[in-house]
Every structure is written in structure tokens, then in C-alpha cells.
Amino acid sequence: MRSESKKLECIILAAGFSSRLGEEKTLIGVGNRSLIGWVSKRISDRGVEPIVITRPDIIGEVTQSTEECRVLSNPYPERGRTGTIKIGISELDRSDSEGYRLMIVPVDRPGFSNSTLDLMMSSNKSCCPSKNGRGGHPLLLTEADINRVREAPSDAPLSSIVSPTKIEVKDPFLHLNVDTPEDLIELSKFLSFFEGNIEN
């Protein structure tokens, strides 16, 4: 049960570049918010205050978009996603001496449903949602896997460090990846679907 679980923490990854999209993906509009503001609110509405890791050149705009979230900068985002995660873990380690579970949410992979989000947040094992056998996001890590990330090189692919259990879900937009102008069309379709199925 949730009450028996270790405390849940969350890192939102927003340090990637947007060369293929042609505009800053983290800051694209989602209703009256930016994408990072919309994703972070989905997490904070469930009682978890996420840490956002972004790039130095957009940290001011990201901070303004995320209200009361802690926002940190990765000065070397080109070294890869694992290095960004390690920055967040180091920050969490300063205040969470008793250990924690960690949910990792890439800002450009927002197509998970609320039910999938709740499923990940309640898990006591390292896992990720899956559709048609292909893993998606968010990713939930246990203490043991968090420690593996701590000890790994910053440029190591996350897939070489942890092997989460895949949990099959029905989310039609689970594999949405906001990376190109064409993906913005899919993002719009997802938002329409999400607003029409807000409890799902």
C-alpha cells in the first residue's frame, strides 16, 4: 500500500535541446501554461513537488513557468540524460537521508494518462508503463536502482544501468515524443483526449 512505501520524489528532465523542433520544447504553449508548467502541475497536484532540471540558457523562463518547484541547471546537458538525473539525485540526497523512491518524467514525453501516473507513483518496484511491449514514461526507481544511477558514469545510457519491469497500459498516446513540428500535432490530439478523459 502507498502508506508502506518509501517517500516518493520526482525529477522532471527538461535539459534536452530542441534542434529538430525549431523552438524550445520545454516552453511550448499548453493552454495557458508552458509544457513544463503543465507537466509539473500534474505531478504537484498529486502531492509531490518535483525538481526540474534544465539548461542554463532557459533556467529563468523555466523557473517562472513552474511556480514553486525547485529548478536546477545542468551545465553539461550534452553529456546525456543520466548526468541530468544524477544532478537531481544529488539534490534530493541532501534532504532525504532515509531513502526514497524516484519517479523520472521527461518533459517531452507527456502522453501518459492520470491512471498510469497513479500506477507509477504507487509502485514499490522499479517499473515503467508499456504499450505493445515497448516501454514508456514515467519511470519509477527503487532505492537499489537509484544507487546504481548514483554510481554510474554521467554519460552511460540509462537503459544500461537499470531494467525496470514493464507494466502494460492502454494509454493511446504513451509513446508521444515532442521532438519535431509533426509531433506538435500529436501533442494537440493528446491534449484534446486528455481534457475529455481527465479521470483516466
Label the predicted regions.
Residues 4-56:
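N-terminal glycine-rich phosphate-binding loop and ensuing alpha1 helix
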Residues 78-148:
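Conserved beta-loop-beta/alpha segment of the NTase-like Rossmann-fold superfamily
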Residues 13-15, 105-106, 129-130, 168-170:
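Short beta-strand segments
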Residues 22, 30-34, 57, 75-83, ...:
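Residues at secondary-structure transition points
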Residues 2-8, 147-200:
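Conserved alpha/beta core of the MobA/IspD/sugar-nucleotide pyrophosphorylase nucleotidyltransferase superfamily
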